[in-house]
Amino acid sequence: SNRIDIERDSENTNYFCVPIPPSVRVENVTIENHYMDRQLWVSIEPEKMQDEEAFYEQNGVYGNCEKVVDGHFEVERKRICLQFQLTDVYEYRSIFEDNTLYIEFVPPREVYEKIVVIDPAYGREDTGAATESVASKDITLNVAKALKEKLDKTDIKVYYTRMDDSNPEAERRVGLAEAARADMLIRIEVNSAESSKQYGTEAVYNSRFFIPGFGSVELADLLEREVVTAISGKANGLIEASAEDTVISEATVPAAAIKVGYLTNGQESILLQRED
């Protein structure tokens, strides 16, 4: 990938300014917030690729660049992708005019009143407990996707630590909740046991940080009751997070993990694989 020139001492403005090739219309520009990586991507798909590559070799970004660490661009067959590394997790507002994309970076708290981070456990080679037909990493991801469908219809802003088969380090998962100043961090896990007779739902809470009002214990209790009610399941109670529960024990925002069921129990294993 090629570096994008950043003019740091440019004019006094609130906006980070990205020049767009003259042949490109607004509907050919897409912005993606890769908040887990603290990156903002601007994708440009011109009607036909001309000398767009040369355009970014000659034209840098300018304006208010204090939240931008650096920038690169990659040219693919039909599109150019500009990738900007940011100093933190931000939301953005954008305006496109005179072939310039004006971007304003805003802390999530300035835009949203309610912020939640959902953390589907496991990922990649860390499958979690697995049977011949399914791995825990897929169950937690499916639960997150189902939650997204519901939560997208509310006024709650939700950040997800993963939405594919990736496995971010525990520090990055916790870091997202801290950076977004989330009201709560909810981790989704799957249980397993030696005995196939064991079943039910448990919630793990962070006991290290006492948060008055609505804290980790209250969150864990609420999660367990909601899940048990929704699936007509059995509540096994609340468990204090141990040092191994890094994501929950390191968080300084209210944090709890909901262990949705036992993959080692025949009946629950079937339930966990159902679409609904």
Predicted regions span which residues?
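Active-site-adjacent loop/helix surface patches within enzyme catalytic domains
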Residues: 169-193, 229-233, 244-252
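Active-site-adjacent substrate-binding region
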Residues: 215-241
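Active-site histidine-acidic residue metal-binding/catalytic motifs
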Residues: 100-176, 180-184, 199, 205-207, ...
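Short linear recognition/processing motifs and adjacent strand/loop elements at protein termini
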Residues: 1-117, 124, 135, 147-149, ...
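Solvent-exposed loop/turn segments at secondary-structure junctions
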Residues: 123-125, 163-168, 190-195, 209-211, ...
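Active-site-adjacent mobile loop/cap segments within catalytic or ligand-binding domains
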Residues: 194, 237-276
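Surface-exposed patches in mature extracellular/periplasmic domains of secreted proteins
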Residues: 29, 156-164, 188, 231-240
